[in-house]
Amino acid sequence: MVFRVAIAQYLGVECPVAREDAALGLTLAGPRTGAQAGVDTPVDAHGVEVSRAILPGGSMTVCHDETANELFTICEEAGLETRREPRDIFTHALPVGVAARAAAEADVRGDRTGQAEGRHAVIPDAAIRVSMPRALDSAAAAVRPHTARLPMRRLLFDVKTVHAGTSHYRSARARRQRGGAVQARAQDVEAAYRRHAQRLDRIHHPPGTPRHRHPVGPIEQVVLRHSRVRGLVFGAYGEWSSDVEWLLEEAARAAARRDWRRMGCPSESVAYSRIVASYRRRMGLVAVREMARHRIRQSAYVGLTRQQLDDIMHERERQRDRREAAMVAADRSVEIAQSYVVPAFERGA
């Protein structure tokens, strides 16, 4: 079924998991609040509404995580210095305890979006030491990008997925430029990180406090110190942003430098061409597969009422709360056990 859904998406024909639901007139329950409160959305035969709907179950997060995992696994296999979700980069700029609380919350909730509004800290998806071309910061730059690579340095990366039917695909840039939807989304990442850093600075380091003596706060300074945050964006049709392509190329170069003799290639450049082609195929298959799986998972919620969706969401929240309580109880048990441990010098050791 995954293959059939992926092919239907690529060819622009009716989606196998949405076609029958659309013929039966089934709907997706509308939100409880807002301008569209109580207004159900009819399922379309192509599955666009199913793909972009915000539903319980965390399917969009699963799609994001599986895609990101494959990309960073490629980087690690190639020998690039890769750190996933580096939570200590901003630790020194945050008050004591705030970063630890953010990390604990992310672990308990299975959250991979630490930079989202309302979170306690800034947690990028990865920090990778790499040499890449200058980041694209405008639509014009995307048309004729600079391909000269900058010196090796640690960069921050954030993975995003763009689903069919969202505003990114309806924009003028998406209609005008090939890959415009993912490029535009990638260029939004830097601004989102800086806004979130500024928000945290306002909370923890208001202007005038000892640590906020510069035009920008200490948390935003950390973001700026890492150059521009790179957006690794994957689209609904298997396309990806320039930074994904450049990262795959850099991984292939690193692997070719290390393995070209072992591969039996006459030169490093021949090994590079083989490796980069395999990385592109591998990444493309995973990106398309996860988009198809996302649509299949989402289709399970078609026809349910808003009350049923709310009940599912509340049950998942209760399960998360129970996991959090269990973690706290386990930590407390360790503390109690440690209090009864007799030091070695008292045991005569």
Would you name each region that the model predicts?
Residues 84-90:
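Long, charged, glycine-rich C-terminal linkers/tails
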Residues 42, 70-73, 80:
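Gly/Pro/Ser/Thr-rich low-complexity, intrinsically disordered segments predominantly at protein N-termini
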